[in-house]
């Protein structure tokens, strides 16, 4: 099952049960687009929704979460999971928060996983998205744990930048060439710095000798 239908939303209304939804995959797979869509559906269903994005990701906007295709959603720009917690506590004093969205969860500190669990246990729906693996094809922090704990996991694929086949890997490009193994892990520059690649076209990063 990849997403929730109206019956499950109604069950939430009556039982006040929280859960975790994880949207993951490689670069350019449409994760943010799907993330925004789900939060909008719940907002239309009269749920109070708050969205958060990491301060490191300011490619398109500081105030909005924006997908590569241009879809946007109002959000808080935050530096840590503790800041997320503080904002939620403050907003709950105004009106109870029903849904929390966290964009690019792999860029947050590792305490964010514990916070997400706490929120779900409090009856809040938590929807997060993030890369499942880095450009070396190693598991990304936070997402690796959420793959285990989330009630709902959607793994999206892109199309290979080179051959057009299904892609589930992110190739980091530096100066027109695949990045070396020791290249910095985090580089948020969109399509100019990354390409979606399939298994056949992906080039395993080389280690400097």
UniProtKB/Swiss-Prot annotation:
Subcellular location: Cytoplasm
Source species of the chain: Mycoplasma mycoides subsp. mycoides SC (strain CCUG 32753 / NCTC 10114 / PG1)
Reactions this protein catalyses: thymidine + ATP = dTMP + ADP + H(+)
GO MF entry, a single one: zinc ion binding
Subunit structure: Homotetramer.
UniProt keyword annotations, A-Z: ATP-binding, Cytoplasm, DNA synthesis, Kinase, Metal-binding, Nucleotide-binding, Transferase, Zinc
Annotated Pfam families: TK
Keyword Plastid: no
Enzyme Commission number(s) of this protein: 2.7.1.21
PANTHER family per record: THYMIDINE KINASE (PTHR11441), THYMIDINE KINASE, CYTOSOLIC (PTHR11441:SF0)
Residues annotated for Zn(2+) binding in this entry: 160, 163, 198, 201
Residues reported in the UniProt entry to bind ATP: 25-32, 103-106
Residue numbers annotated as active site: 104 (proton acceptor)
GO cellular component, one term: cytosol
GO biological process: DNA biosynthetic process; thymidine metabolic process
Similarity comment: family membership: Belongs to the thymidine kinase family.
Protein encoded by which gene: tdk
The keyword Cytoplasm is assigned to this record: yes
The protein, known as: Thymidine kinase
Chief site of localization: cytoplasm
Entry-linked NCBIfam families: PRK04296.1-1 (NF003296)
């Amino acid at each position: 099952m990849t997403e929730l239908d109206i019956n499950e939303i109604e069950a939430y209304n009556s039982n006040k049960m929280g859960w975790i939804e994880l949207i993951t995959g490689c670069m350019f797979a449409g994760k943010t687009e799907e993330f925004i869509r789900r939060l909008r559906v719940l907002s239309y269903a009269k749920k109070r929704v708050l969205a958060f994005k990491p301060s490191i990701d300011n490619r398109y906007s500081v105030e909005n979460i924006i997908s590569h295709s241009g879809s946007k959603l109002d959000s808080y720009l935050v530096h840590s999971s503790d800041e997320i917690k503080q904002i939620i506590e403050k907003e709950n004093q105004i009106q109870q928060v029903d849904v929390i969205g966290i964009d690019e969860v792999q860029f947050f500190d590792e305490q964010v996983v514990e916070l997400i669990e706490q929120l779900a246990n409090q009856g809040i729906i938590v929807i997060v998205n993030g890369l499942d693996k880095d450009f070396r094809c190693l598991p990304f922090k936070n997402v690796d744990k959420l793959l285990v704990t989330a009630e709902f996991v959607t793994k999206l694929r892109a199309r290979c930048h080179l051959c057009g086949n299904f892609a589930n890997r992110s190739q980091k490009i530096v100066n027109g060439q695949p990045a070396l193994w020791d290249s910095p892990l985090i580089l948020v520059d969109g399509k100019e710095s990354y390409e979606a690649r399939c298994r056949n076209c992906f080039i395993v990063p080389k280690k400097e000798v």
